């Protein structure tokens, strides 16, 4: 299953370049440009470190049932850890069909309906049914092949796919896996790129773009919340880049730009916190992963940080630093007995500035 790495052989969780994350129980799986780490968030300890190459995405059901993609430059491998064995799929070994470029840039691993596994690549996206891979060729754009990067699934069995073409124009569409047909959806972010996407409990598709903010699509209409909503928007949000768009259990939407984590509640859109380190001035947030009341924050130079949506605290993950006290029994009821008011750093406060976000009884409010 790859080489078991020592601490000296792979960059630790507080220093690594994070490419993707997923969660099983209290264990956080972190894909880096060297391999992957498994970090126990309750104990604050790295359980496993594997040097398996430059990862681009990872999904997992357990330590002995996980998938990851490895970037080899002009090709990629898709790898399944099953027990003590690892099976590698690629164009080179004949497992991935579609021609010599069908696994180039593989990323966006996702679990789909009926225990299927999906990933995107240059010109194709692929589905694994437990026995073999099926490749789907995307409709031709005006600029050649589409590089598919993101997948989302609704309760009706629809697969939503998004990517870019050769001129970095975005494509977003609805895919019917039964008919094997994709229907592109016209959108005003077609000259942008999609970097994140998910489906909420009401089957709305949420889409994070590189430069145009984030959208909700209800099957007929797009809403751009960076420009079309009536939310109070923090003056510190000076960009419409939305990295890692996701939803916390309380319904709030989160995304990142540069070093900042942004919270959108419907009434306000504010910077909830920042990841700063004077020794790493070029550090930036690369991805987010929501789990219970926590948002895990991956960065390019300082590893993983954890944002607590109840207290507003951000903690850098490191060996010896537990960040989650009971993640396997996450309390989704945010009601507290105390009426104290806290700012987003978790400090009790009485002095609220206009436009400041604060927490009372476990709920966030915007001070108009």
Place the predicted regions along the sequence by residue:
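Short coil-to-beta transitions that initiate beta-strands within beta-rich domains
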Residues: 9-24, 48-63, 90-113, 137-156, ...
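Conserved beta-propeller blade signature
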Residues: 27-30, 66-68, 116-118, 158-161, ...
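Residue-level detector of functionally pivotal "anchor" positions at catalytic/ligand-binding pockets or at interdomain
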Residues: 310-347
């Amino acid at each position: 299953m790859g080489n078991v790495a020592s601490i000296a052989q792979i960059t630790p969780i507080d220093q690594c370049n994070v490419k993707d994350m997923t969660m099983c129980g209290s264990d956080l799986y972190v894909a880096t440009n060297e391999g992957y780490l498994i970090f126990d968030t309750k104990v604050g300890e790295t359980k496993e470190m594997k040097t398996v190459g430059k990862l681009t995405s990872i999904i997992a059901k357990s330590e002995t049932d996980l998938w990851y993609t490895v970037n080899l430059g002009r090709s990629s491998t898709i790898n399944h850890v099953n027990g003590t064995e690892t099976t590698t799929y690629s164009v080179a070994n004949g497992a991935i069909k579609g021609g010599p470029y069908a696994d180039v840039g593989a990323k966006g691993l996702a679990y789909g309906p009926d225990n299927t596994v999906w990933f995107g690549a240059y010109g194709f996206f692929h589905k694994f049914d437990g026995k073999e891979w099926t490749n789907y060729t995307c409709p031709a754009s005006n600029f050649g092949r589409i590089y598919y990067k993101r997948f989302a699934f609704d309760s009706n069995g629809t697969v939503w796919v998004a990517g870019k073409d050769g001129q970095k124009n975005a494509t977003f569409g609805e895919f019917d896996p039964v008919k094997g047909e994709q229907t592109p959806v016209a959108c005003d972010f077609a000259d942008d790129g999609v970097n994140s996407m998910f489906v909420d409990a009401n089957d709305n598709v949420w889409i994070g773009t590189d430069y145009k903010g984030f959208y909700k699509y209800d099957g007929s209409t797009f809403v751009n919340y960076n420009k079309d909503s009536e939310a109070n928007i923090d003056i510190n949000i000076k960009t419409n880049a939305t990295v890692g768009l996701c939803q916390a259990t309380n319904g709030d939407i989160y995304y990142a730009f540069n070093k900042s984590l942004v919270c959108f509640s419907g009434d306000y859109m504010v910077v909830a916190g920042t990841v700063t380190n004077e020794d790493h001035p070029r550090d930036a947030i690369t991805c987010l992963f929501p789990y219970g009341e926590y948002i895990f924050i991956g960065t390019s130079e300082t590893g993983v940080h954890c944002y607590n949506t109840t207290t507003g605290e951000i903690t850098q993950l490191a060996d010896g630093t537990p960040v989650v006290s009971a993640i396997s029994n996450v309390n989704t009821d945010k009601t507290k007995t105390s009426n104290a008011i806290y700012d987003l750093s978790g400090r009790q406060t009485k002095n609220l500035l206009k436009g400041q976000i604060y927490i009372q009884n476990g709920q966030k409010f915007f001070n108009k």
